Regions:
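Carbohydrate-interacting regions of secretory-pathway proteins
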Residues: 23-208
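Bacterial N-terminal signal peptides
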Residues: 11-21
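Bacterial N-terminal signal peptides that target proteins for export
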Residues: 2-10
Length: 208
């Protein structure tokens, strides 16, 4: 009897060990891509998946909090930051489906009428295979070089730096835009939903 009990104990122990080992290999797509940047280095959290206290909704997109992100798939609209920024670095985690038409707009000139003509639009638009509008491009400013990157159906990261007239965009740690332009000096930031499914999970900003 003791031998049987001991065998059962060993089997259970081995099962638990395998289970715990497997938990340490959670796919990165299911976790936050970035570790939270240090406040000591000047980083500020604009969105952490829990509330939209630092944003104002414009338009009729059906923004809602769900499963640690904010997402929309109906209507067209923006989430606009309540503060304006001049020189900064911003990190954004996003997920888009194949139909998504979205983007991150910076240095808005008019937060009530947001377009790529009165701000810088860093695009999220796999569906339009045009170097001027593809994912990774700055619309009207910097075309995306082929092969064009695709963001659909996975978590991605944008890291955007605006310092003076220098604009740099990194998509999943790859530079997709590095250009000088002085049209817009400062303004709020906006997250767009204009078709398809778009989700934003984390947004951090560091004034420079």
């Amino acid at each position: 009897m003791k031998s049987v009990s001991k065998s059962i104990f060993v089997v259970i122990a081995l099962f638990l060990a395998v289970l715990l080992q497997g938990c340490s290999y959670i796919p990165k797509s299911l976790t936050s891509w970035y570790d939270a940047p240090s406040k000591d280095e000047g980083w500020v959290t604009l969105f952490d998946g829990n509330n939209l206290n630092q944003w104002t909704a414009i338009g009729n997109a059906n923004w809602r909090l769900y499963d640690g992100s904010v997402q929309a798939e109906i209507g067209s609209g923006f989430l606009v930051s309540k503060k304006s920024y001049k020189d900064f670095q911003i990190k954004v985690e996003f997920w888009a489906d194949e139909e998504a038409n979205s983007g991150i707009f910076i240095r808005l000139s008019d937060s009530k009428n947001i377009t790529a003509d009165n701000s810088y639009e860093v695009n999220i638009f796999d569906k339009r295979p045009d170097p001027s509008y593809g994912t990774g491009a700055i619309v009207n400013i910097s075309k995306i070089a082929p092969p064009m990157p695709l963001a659909a159906n996975k978590w991605n990261t944008y890291e955007i730096t605006a310092k003076g007239d220098q604009l740099t965009v990194m998509l999943n740690d790859v530079v997709t835009a590095d250009v000088k332009d002085a049209k817009f000096a400062s303004g709020p930031i906006a997250l767009q939903s204009a078709g398809g499914v778009i989700k934003f999970r984390r947004v951090w900003i560091k004034p420079l």
